[in-house]
Design a protein with these regions (language model features):
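Predominantly soluble domains enriched in secretory-pathway, periplasmic, or organellar proteins
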Residues: 12, 22-392
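Hydrophobic alpha-helical segments of integral membrane proteins
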Residues: 14-16
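N-terminal signal peptide c-region/cleavage motif recognized by signal peptidases
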Residues: 18-20
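Bacterial N-terminal signal peptides that target proteins for export
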Residues: 1-8
Length: 392
């Protein structure tokens, strides 16, 4: 059983009650040792990332993880009362009840899922879908009990699931989309997106998302629905083709059409990965791991986002989060511990002036790479975390 352990002496953890006026901007960062370290370690750090805080860059809490878990991404359910951590190394999900403190890790067995990647939760907060890149299937689960309820696989030429990674859901049109990315050992690459029926998990159709004929090996990696778009529009990052695509929903035919909307290769960038939208949905941010940029788009027309500018981050630019007031963008710079794409820092960008304020090197300096960054929801309005945790 995985247990949450607090090293009160060695880590110097101290929890204090703070006044409501004590503003905090806390991030969850799962991390792992950089290559070549004598002892491999994984964990989840809770870090203060507010540039105006006296605790900026400090780790307030550290939650150790098994060193062979290979924790990958962090996802929330719809009300952000629960966090899920996917694992590349084991057929398990980890869950944290964010409304209970101290935080406790709970293991969810998903035996049909190998190399679990991304997770989405239905809009009614009752069902989750988990992509399994190693076993080429998708697992549906009960989001209340966190028990798997259905394993979805398909091999028909017109509707199949192969190396699924990215996933997006829109219950308004009863659709789930999953990308076909790469075989975990990188010996094969996909070039398609598959559409599922959200209520049943029925596999409906598969569509090529690439500028060349199959096998294009474009490796679509992430797919997201653009907020507030009517008709619904998805955006897709093609990791190995270095392009951004859009899928537009047709209410009459109840089908998507797909088209390329930007080319990162022309910008001398490679490996587009994650996407992020602001609250209004009129801004889109796309990271590229080579050589490390975040691209800003005017997303007023989601069917054709307009490129505004690229801001240099660091090699391995991957996940990003916005501060609640959308003044700051934080970019986590590490991609699978890969050489040349694992800087290990967190870049802080001032969006008011479109400039880099600096980097948080806390994990990097200790010999670790962050794998994901998410803002920690505040379910304790009158409390705060204060600590000075040193990683060894």
């Amino acid at each position: 059983m995985l247990r949450l352990r607090f090293f009160l002496v060695t880590l110097g953890l101290l929890v204090l009650w703070a006044s409501p006026a004590s503003a905090e901007l806390l991030a969850l960062l799962n991390y792992e040792s950089k290559p070549g370290q004598p002892v491999r370690r994984e964990g989840i750090a809770i870090m203060e990332i507010d540039p105006e805080s006296a605790d900026f860059g400090k780790i307030l809490m550290d939650i150790p993880l098994p060193s062979d878990l290979v924790a990958h991404h962090i996802f929330f359910n719809r009300d952000k009362s629960k966090a899920y951590i996917t694992s590349l190394g084991k057929s398990v999900l980890l869950a944290i009840d964010l409304t209970r403190f101290p935080y406790r890790l709970r293991t969810i067995d998903v035996p049909d899922c190998q190399v679990n990647e991304d997770l989405v939760v239905s809009e009614d907060n009752k069902t989750w879908f988990l992509t399994c890149m190693g076993s080429s299937n998708v697992v549906m689960g009960d989001a209340q009990t966190d028990r798997p309820i259905k394993t979805i696989s398909a091999s028909d030429a017109a509707a199949f699931i192969l190396y699924p990674h990215g996933i997006a859901i829109h219950n308004g049109i009863d659709r789930v989309l999953v990308t076909s990315t790469v075989k975990p050992d990188m010996s094969d690459q996909g070039d398609t997106v598959t559409v599922l029926e959200a209520k049943t998990g029925k596999v409906l159709s598969t569509h090529q998302v690439a500028s060349k004929p199959t096998p294009a090996k474009s490796a679509p990696v992430e797919v997201m629905f653009s907020p507030n778009s009517n008709p619904p529009v998805v955006h897709i990052t093609n990791m190995l083709e270095d392009t951004l695509w859009a899928g537009i929903w047709d209410p009459k035919s109840k089908a998507f059409t797909f088209a390329q909307v930007d080319d990162f290769g022309a910008k001398e960038q490679g490996m587009p990965l994650e996407m992020l939208y602001n609250k209004e949905g009129d801004r889109l941010f796309v990271t590229t791991a080579k050589t490390g940029f975040v691209n800003l788009y005017d997303n007023s027309e989601p069917r054709q986002p307009k490129f505004i500018k690229a801001i240099a981050s660091a090699p391995g630019a991957h996940h990003s989060v916005l501060s609640p007031d959308e003044r700051y963008l934080f970019v986590q710079n590490s991609f699978l511990n890969l050489e040349g794409m694992s800087d290990g820092s967190i870049t802080v960008i001032d969006l008011k002036n479109d400039k880099v304020l600096g980097n948080i090197d806390t994990l990097k300096s200790a010999g670790y790479n962050p794998n994901c960054i998410m803002l920690l929801p505040n379910h304790f309005q009158n409390s705060g975390l204060r600590a000075n945790v040193h990683l060894h």
